[in-house]
A protein has these predicted regions:
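Repeated scaffold domains used in trafficking and secretory/extracellular systems
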Residues: 1-8, 40-49, 80-89
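Short coil turn/linker residues within repeat-based beta-strand modules
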Residues: 18, 28-29, 68-69, 109
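Conserved Ser/Thr-centered positions that define the repeating blades of beta-propeller domains
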Residues: 24-25, 64-65, 105-106
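Tryptophan-centered short beta-strand motifs
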Residues: 31-32, 71-72, 112-113
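Surface loop/turn motifs at the tips and blade-to-blade linkers of beta-strand repeat domains
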Residues: 35-39, 75-78, 116
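Blade-level signature of beta-propeller repeat domains, shared across WD40, Kelch, NHL, RCC1
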Residues: 100-116
Length: 116
């Protein structure tokens, strides 16, 4: 699961030790905390998508349009709270659940459909 992404000339990561979103402008030599709130829950995965960062957490799907400084709820359904990984698949987002199901979204994570 990519807990480290490249976005707008920065490395952005989930620090699993403290659930903070951190960034580096020097290729990971040093890290600066960017988001340390708890309203989104525990971050599980990040993906850059259409100029935003999409995150899956134990509370659902969130997005940031300002490099992870703030996060806006996209989908907090019971199914979205089971997502453990998210991936950019071109024209859609893919998300895998903790029980192995695959979902896709064609509207930047607002709604999800289980792939059969």
């Amino acid at each position: 699961m990519p807990q480290l992404i490249t976005f707008n000339n920065e490395l952005i990561r989930i620090n699993p030790a403290n659930n903070r979103i951190e960034y580096s402008t020097n290729r990971g030599i040093s890290w600066i905390s960017r988001y340390s709130g708890s309203s989104c829950g525990t971050f599980r995965d990040l993906v850059p998508y259409n100029g935003k960062i999409i995150a899956v957490t134990d509370k659902g799907v969130y997005y940031s349009s300002n490099k992870g400084i703030s996060w806006i709820s996209r989908n907090t359904s019971s199914q979205a709270r089971t997502f453990i990984a998210v991936q950019d698949a071109g024209r859609e987002l893919l998300a895998q659940t903790n029980d192995g199901h695959l979902y896709y979204s064609t509207n930047e994570g607002i709604s999800w459909i289980r792939r059969r």
